[in-house]
Design a protein with these regions (language model features):
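Long, contiguous internal "core" modules enriched in hydrophobic/ aromatic residues
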Residues: 9, 18, 59, 79, ...
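Short, highly charged, low-complexity non-transmembrane loops/tails of multi-pass membrane proteins
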Residues: 42, 449-470
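Hydrophobic cores of alpha-helical transmembrane segments in multi-pass inner/ER membrane proteins
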Residues: 120-125, 157-158, 209-220, 284-299, ...
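Membrane-interface transmembrane-helix boundary segments in multi-pass integral membrane proteins
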Residues: 276-282, 347-367, 415-439, 443
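Central hydrophobic cores of alpha-helical transmembrane segments
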Residues: 388-399
């Protein structure tokens, strides 16, 4: 069995502690933001081009005075009314910028939280697919996937805390939760949000979120216990068949809840916008990341001798999935972007306008990281079985898909008030440390080999014919 070393425990706990301290500092700093800070930000943003704008205004006013000399008094009255309206607009803009500044620590934490929870969830879904498809090649890495899904419970609890905080108006992350958005008598009334209030309401949002988390964690709890029981059951595969049935039910519920989750937790950040393939898009970005994490831990455990039956063919198949779903993600990204951009419907293009202006570098950069790098590093069949190629390509993939989630969240919650600093780094450290700790701790508690699985022998003899093995491997890996 694998031994969770003291050094790795210390390392993972250190990451968690660093993350907690940095996140606490970020939340404290965010809570200290005032309307004066918002005014300074607005003033700084107006400095660029202020002189030329001033000159244009002066010229325009001179021309207007010459053309409307006889209506000077009326102009002054209109100007007074305009000043009153302008003051109100300025106050609203300052408040909006203040909310963006206060949102930043929440948003940075939410990006890392959603990414970590999503990866864990998709590892669980990929695990269920192996059960339902009754495949043979992946049996030796089932315990790796089970160990990774140990991260589901803590991230689910944290997500529930963030959701409850949002419902209690402790942040301004979800704009549809603002007061008065569905009250026709309020100055803050929003007809579009009101039209969607049957779905976007705090009670329904909270109930659905709890339901998602309960369904996912219930399956994980059941399948983990039943998988261990499978090793010693000796009951004519009855336990195995129960696990198959449970996995079928879970996958059915997963496909529904994953789409609904993406609408609630991500698309709900832009309540005026919608995309019919958004659930698939979120699925693709999380699935590629999940496969990468599975490959990383499999390579690590194999290097420590904990997975003696895993050979280059298993690694090769994981890399094939990483490559294939990177292409699938690119297809969905291009389909969503191209159709919306060229249809040029204002209600839809507004989503990409902010991302293509204020976030142009990360928006285009993630396409390079999520498509170009996987193509270059993983297209060659030989490279797919080389651990260091997979680590390089996988690291870029994970960074690229973190940026993808960053782009989904930040433009909606902080607008142009974004940069990469302590809040983002702290959140990443916390959830990386949590993933390492929960995975290694879970893997060290049980046998790494699912001895009771009827397809175990097939996995032990799995060999991809196109891979060149060494003489030692060749003697044991062939059928």
């Amino acid at each position: 069995m694998y031994q969770f070393s003291g050094k790795l425990k210390t390392f993972s706990l250190a990451l968690i502690i660093i993350g907690v301290i940095g996140t606490a500092f970020s939340f404290y700093s965010g809570s200290q933001k005032t309307i004066e800070d918002a005014k300074h930000v607005i003033e700084a943003s107006h400095n660029v081009g202020h002189g030329s704008s001033h000159e244009e205004t002066a010229v325009h006013n001179d021309v207007a005075d010459l053309e409307n000399h006889t209506a000077k008094a009326d102009t002054h009255v209109a100007a007074d009314a305009h000043d009153t309206s302008s003051d109100k607009e300025h106050a609203e803009h300052e408040l909006h910028v203040l909310h963006q500044l206060q949102n930043r620590p929440w948003s940075a934490f939410y990006v890392a939280l959603f990414f970590s929870l999503g990866i864990t969830l998709l590892v669980l879904a990929f695990y269920a697919i192996q059960r339902v498809a009754q495949v043979g090649w992946s049996i030796l890495i089932l315990r790796v996937m089970e160990a990774i899904t140990a991260n589901l419970l803590p991230t689910s609890i944290i997500m529930l805390v963030v959701i409850v905080a949002s419902v209690m108006h402790l942040n301004h992350v979800f704009p549809w939760m603002a007061e008065g958005t569905v009250d026709p008598m309020s100055d803050n009334y929003d007809a579009i949000i009101d039209g969607k209030s049957g779905w976007m309401n705090a009670t329904g949002f909270l109930i659905r979120s709890i339901a998602y988390l309960l369904i996912w964690n219930a399956y994980r709890f059941f399948i983990r216990r039943s998988s261990i029981k499978e090793d010693t059951a000796n009951d004519g595969n009855k336990t195995y068949k129960k696990n198959f049935t449970a996995s079928v039910i879970f996958l059915f519920l997963f496909m529904i809840t994953e789409s609904m989750m993406s609408w609630d937790w991500i698309m709900g950040l832009d309540p005026h916008w919608f995309s019919t393939l958004f659930g698939w898009y979120v699925l693709a970005t999380l699935l590629v990341s999940a496969l990468t994490v599975i490959a990383f831990f499999t390579i690590y455990f194999r290097s420590k001798g904990a997975l003696p039956g895993v050979n280059d063919s298993h690694i090769h198949d994981l890399a094939k999935f990483m490559f294939g779903f990177s292409v699938f993600w690119t297809y969905l990204w291009f389909s969503q972007f191209m159709l919306i951009w060229y249809a040029d419907i204002p209600e839809e293009t507004t989503y990409f306008v902010m991302r293509f202006t204020e976030y142009k570098l990360p928006f285009l950069g993630m396409v390079v990281m999520n498509f170009v790098f996987p193509i270059l590093l993983l297209l060659n069949s030989d490279f797919k079985s080389k651990p260091w190629f997979i680590f390089i390509g996988g690291f870029v993939i994970l960074v690229g898909h973190y940026v993808d989630v960053f782009i989904m969240v930040m433009p909606s919650t902080v607008g142009s008030q974004w940069y990469f600093g302590i809040p983002e780094i702290s959140a990443i450290c916390f959830f990386v440390g949590l993933l390492i700790f929960t995975t290694l701790r879970s893997f060290s508690k049980v046998s790494p080999i699912p001895a009771g699985n009827p397809f175990l022998k097939e996995s032990e003899h799995f060999h991809y014919y196109n891979i060149e093995h060494s003489d030692e491997e060749g003697s044991t890996d062939h059928h």
